């Protein structure tokens, strides 16, 4: 069993996680924040089970990303980046052509796509094209209406 303790505050504020995050079967998802891909890669390389939250770095080196084989990546955070639109955008805005092409690369390498933070349109695009889909940290619209929470139709797609 794996625990996904990728609290953004832990990876964003201090720049370093406690040692136990690197020694156990805990997924260490590195949040992009203001750091470069090179800096994020340094954190992720220490992890036993690396992942990335918002992999839309301008300096993204796809070969380096594939080298460490993250369990999953989120393509966006709440906003827009090179791959698509996050949940801050209208539901009809989804993945950009570069995002769709990137999913093909992730599929070829067995890396899951995390649909947390993505727009409703992006969610549809991910479901249609990604071979492995996860949702690492989102709640349910039926419990609390929020732009990031999943609607019932999305839960059906994930099930």
Stretches found by the model and what they are:
Residues 1-97, 130-133, 141, 145-159:
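N-terminal hydrophobic targeting/anchoring segments and the immediately downstream early-domain regions
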């Amino acid at each position: 069993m794996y625990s996904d303790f990728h609290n953004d505050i832990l990876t964003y504020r201090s720049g370093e996680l406690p040692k136990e995050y690197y020694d156990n079967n805990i997924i260490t998802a590195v949040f992009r924040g203001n750091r470069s891909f090179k800096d994020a890669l340094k954190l992720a390389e220490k992890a036993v089970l690396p992942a990335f939250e918002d992999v839309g770095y301008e300096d993204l080196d796809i070969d380096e990303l594939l080298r460490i084989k993250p369990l999953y990546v989120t393509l966006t955070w709440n906003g827009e980046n090179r791959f698509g639109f996050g949940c801050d955008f209208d539901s009809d805005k989804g993945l950009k052509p570069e995002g769709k092409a990137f999913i093909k690369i992730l599929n070829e390498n067995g890396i899951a796509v995390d649909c947390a933070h993505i727009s409703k349109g992006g969610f549809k695009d991910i479901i249609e094209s990604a071979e492995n889909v996860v949702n690492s940290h989102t709640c349910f619209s039926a419990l609390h209406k929020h732009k990031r929470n999943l609607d019932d139709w999305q839960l059906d797609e994930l099930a």
